[in-house]
Curated annotation (Swiss-Prot):
It is found in: Cell inner membrane. This is Protein MxiA. Its main location: membrane. One of its GO terms (cellular component) is plasma membrane. InterPro entries: FHIPEP_1, FHIPEP_3, FHIPEP_4, FHIPEP_CS, T3SS_FHIPEP, T3SS_HrcV. Necessary for the secretion of IPA invasins. Keywords: Cell inner membrane, Cell membrane, Membrane, Plasmid, Protein transport, Transmembrane, Transmembrane helix, Transport, Virulence. PROSITE patterns: FHIPEP.
Length: 686
């Protein structure tokens, strides 16, 4: 029979709960022997500890969604157990070893001390923990219900924007509904704890007063004997009931005060957040030391605390820094291997391969060996990331730097996703001049010339800075020139750095300030199209920091225009003032215009399809137009004139694509992007 029952339990674990409920009902009616009461008291304590530990280690509130039901069952079990122990106390003046031991241990030689300790435990549970948890549950339930419509709308918006699919939306709605029901259940379930605490107090007085009366009238005890016996039993019974109740109350407090969204358990979150800020640790350490110096205070106690906090401070600042560096080293494998004609294998070996992420490292800079100082380079990279965000509104991923024995002293190589993307010649011990000046040769200043994107860069020793200032040469530091070249390389490959996930992260922050605007944009544009718009803007050196203006433009034009390329042109027109401010000099924009013949030739080559528009010119016409443009643009470049190409709005993107291979650094703008506050200086019409 037992074997059959165990087999049923293994397939139907709910039978355990059913048996427990039947046992609780039986405890209300049937008198129990003391040894069985001891077992049930021990079971009650262990169950309370089990619930306490379970609530402590949950990672989100839905991980313990059965807690209100568990709370009801444990409360009923505890009250039924109190009835059984009260029956034993009043009838036999004996409630088992556990209750007697608890009472004797707490009371000791003083009944007054025992009452005080028991009163403190009861007050802490009833007034502090239970009342606080009850209030938190009430507020959480109200806010959960009030926030449901907004959360439902957010799920619908994500579904329309293509961020989630129908299955994901269904799962989110299910989670939202379960959370709302759970918070509502908590609001009522906390009344169980409150009622249990009140019932426990009443049972204590009944056992004490009734026990003394029964002891004197039925058991022939003296007043002092009855008072001593029943006080020990009453306080012992109260403690074995209140301690599990206290653990359950704390468990309820843990769950209702937990904030959803954290991936770790509560203990880990508490430790990481309290001790996560090194500055707080060192300040607290100093204050602890100062308190220890006050007259009459035990200095050694506070000194020990201060030393512990200081040790934690150094652990955070030094050990974790080294740990982060080692983790960044192992985040991806950037090594190479060579295969030669020898018989020996030269395949690379990676230690602990399974622990390494399969993702590539987004950005790596390779320097020549013995060329970089770690502290200086970390500072420079952080300044580059900060300036790039200021200039273009994009947060770059962490940039790692490595050394290579294959590079020349002043060579730097940029790897994007561990593949070579660009290289630079930067002389960090010199200054650079970006415009050629004949007076430099006349002064006899030694110059090292390099080029980047058709720009000739002259590098001069720092000692000649004063001489260069006297001839009005445009001087730039090596760090600034490195940032300029690196930023251009990053923008040329922006599609690999800034994609849908980065766009989503940016829009999540934007939604906190402009939720209605973003909701309107998502009605007509998916996040994929928004990402493409931002990529195209960044690819032509246009900042996306003014995201509000970009979203306003998308909200205006997206309902009428489905072609992403055309949408970009409308966004560029809305950013005209910012585009002009970047290319103008003293309020003037120097431009080169295209003749009607060339514009018509390009316009005739545009083809419209369901997938969008593209340029498909005849080879002869394309070569003729390209040669004409190349010849004229090269002449202007040789004349050292800074200019942009000004064309009609309908062909701007196609002209940019046409000249991109030969003249990538030349900006192409349309008439719609000229702000009325700026004047146009036409250098030439091609």
């Amino acid at each position: 029979m037992i074997q059959s029952f165990l087999k049923q339990v293994s397939t139907k674990p709910e039978l355990i709960i059913l048996v427990l409920m039947v046992m609780i009902i039986a405890m209300l009616i049937i008198p129990l022997p003391t040894y069985l009461v001891d077992f049930l008291i021990g079971l009650n304590i262990v169950l309370a500890i089990l619930v306490f530990m379970g609530s402590f280690y949950i990672e989100r509130i839905l991980s313990f969604s059965t807690f209100p039901s568990v709370l009801l069952i444990t409360t009923l079990f505890r009250l039924a157990l109190s009835i059984s122990t009260s029956r034993l106390i009043l009838v036999d003046a004996d409630a088992g070893k556990i209750i007697t031991t608890f009472g004797q241990f707490v009371i000791g030689d003083s009944l007054a001390v025992g009452f005080v300790i028991f009163s403190i435990v009861t007050v802490v549970q009833f007034i502090v923990i239970t009342k606080g948890s009850e209030r938190v549950a009430e507020v959480a339930a109200r806010f959960s219900l009030d926030g449901m419509p907004g959360k439902q709308m957010s799920i619908d918006a994500d579904l329309k924007a293509g961020i989630i699919d129908a299955a994901g939306a269904k799962e989110r709605r299910s989670i939202l509904e379960r959370e709302s029901q759970l918070y509502g259940s908590f609001d009522g379930a906390m009344k169980f704890i409150k009622g249990d605490a009140i019932a426990g107090i009443i049972i204590i007085f009944v056992n004490l007063i009734g026990g003394i009366s029964v002891g004197m009238s039925q058991h022939g005890m003296s007043l002092s004997g009855a008072l001593s016996t029943y006080t020990i039993l009453t306080i012992g019974d109260g403690l074995v009931s209140q301690i599990p109740a206290l653990l359950i109350s704390i468990s309820a407090g843990f769950i209702v005060t937990r904030v959803n969204g954290d991936s770790d358990n509560m203990g880990r979150n508490i430790m990481s957040q309290i001790f996560g800020n090194p500055f707080v640790l060192i300040v607290t350490s100093a204050l602890a030391l100062a308190i220890g110096m006050l007259p009459g205070f035990p200095f050694f106690v506070f000194f020990l605390i201060a030393v512990t906090l200081t040790a934690l401070f150094y652990y955070k600042k030094v050990v974790e820094k080294e740990k982060s560096l080692s983790e960044s080293d192992s985040s991806g494998y950037t090594g190479t291997f060579d295969i030669d004609n020898s018989h020996d294998s030269s395949l690379a070996m990676i230690e602990n391969l399974d622990a390494i992420s399969s993702e590539t490292v987004p950005l790596i800079l390779l320097f020549a060996e013995n060329k970089i100082n770690a502290n200086d380079m970390e500072g420079l990279i952080e300044r580059i990331r900060s300036q790039f965000f200021i200039d273009y509104g994009v947060r770059l991923p962490t940039i790692l730097y490595r050394t290579s024995n294959e590079l020349k002293v002043d060579d730097i190589v940029l790897l994007i996703n561990e593949v070579r993307a660009d290289s630079f010649n930067i002389y960090f011990d010199k200054v650079c001049i970006t415009d050629e000046n004949g007076d430099i040769d006349a002064l006899g200043i030694p110059v090292v010339s390099t080029s980047y994107n058709e720009r000739v860069i002259s590098w001069v020793d720092v000692s000649y800075t004063e001489n260069l200032t006297n001839i009005d040469a445009k001087i730039k530091s090596a760090q600034d020139e490195f940032y300029h070249q690196l930023s251009q390389a990053l923008l040329n490959n922006i599609n690999e750095i800034f994609g849908i996930q980065e766009t989503k992260n940016m829009l999540d922050q934007f939604e906190n300030r402009y939720p209605d605007l973003l909701k309107e944009v998502f009605r007509h544009v998916t996040i994929q199209r928004i990402s493409e718009v931002l990529q195209r803007l960044l690819g032509e050196n246009i900042s996306v920091r003014n995201l509000k203006l970009i979203m306003e433009s998308l909200a205006l034009w997206a309902p009428r225009e489905k072609d992403v390329i055309t949408l970009v042109e409308h966004v560029r027109a809305s950013l005209s003032r910012y585009i002009c401010s970047k290319i103008a000099v003293s309020g003037e924009i120097k431009v080169v215009m295209l003749s009607g013949y060339i514009e018509d030739a390009i316009r005739k080559g545009i083809r419209q399809t369901s997938g969008g528009s593209f340029l498909n010119m005849d080879i002869e016409v394309s070569d003729e137009v390209m040669e004409t443009l190349a010849h004229a643009l090269r002449e202007l470049r040789n004349a050292k004139k800074n200019f942009v190409l000004l064309v009609s709005v309908d062909i701007r993107r196609f002209v940019k694509r046409l000249i991109d291979n030969r003249f990538k650094s030349i900006l192409v703008i349309s008439y719609a992007e000229i702000d009325e506050a700026y004047t146009i200086n036409v250098l030439k019409t091609i």
